Amino acid sequence: MRKSAAPKRPVVKDPVYDSELVTQLVNKILLDGKKSTAERIVYGALEICREKTGLEPVGTLEKALGNVRPDLEVRSRRVGGATYQVPVEVRPARATTLALRWLVTFTRQRRENTMVERLANEIMDAANGLGASVKRREDTHKMAEANRAFAHYRW
């Protein structure tokens, strides 16, 4: 094991919206090192959000992530011979990472024609409290609530 925790590397703000969240989203969309393609997808999706909602796209993205960020999750903990699903609070950085991961995962599973449309619609759905990524958060919270009896095994 390493002696101390690895230092968090600073996230560079993206040039268009001056937002760390947009940079993180671009990096999550990224496949095979094609960053310009990932940027085109994200910026296109945010533009569609601006046209359809008439609001600032970064605000819409933040609202969407706020609706997708989990507060609790379950982690496996072995006690004796049994493995318990122990509910734990999610640290803010991990909550954001999970929210972005779920957003991108469920964007890829959508049925619209282009990735730009899929991402835009998933962001707008999440901002309105709909969509598969919000459902994933609710399921995660339900799991934590169901296993509340094991909360005293927290570490």
From Swiss-Prot:
Keyword Ribonucleoprotein part of the UniProt annotation: yes
PANTHER family: RIBOSOMAL PROTEIN S7
InterPro entries: Ribosomal_uS7, Ribosomal_uS7_bac/org-type, Ribosomal_uS7_CS, Ribosomal_uS7_dom, Ribosomal_uS7_dom_sf
Name this protein carries in UniProt: Small ribosomal subunit protein uS7
Subunit structure: Part of the 30S ribosomal subunit. Contacts proteins S9 and S11.
Keyword Transmembrane: no
GO cellular component: a single term: small ribosomal subunit
Organism: Corynebacterium efficiens (strain DSM 44549 / YS-314 / AJ 12310 / JCM 11189 / NBRC 100395)
Record SUPFAM superfamilies: Ribosomal protein S7
Gene Ontology MF terms: rRNA binding; structural constituent of ribosome; tRNA binding
Gene Ontology biological process: translation
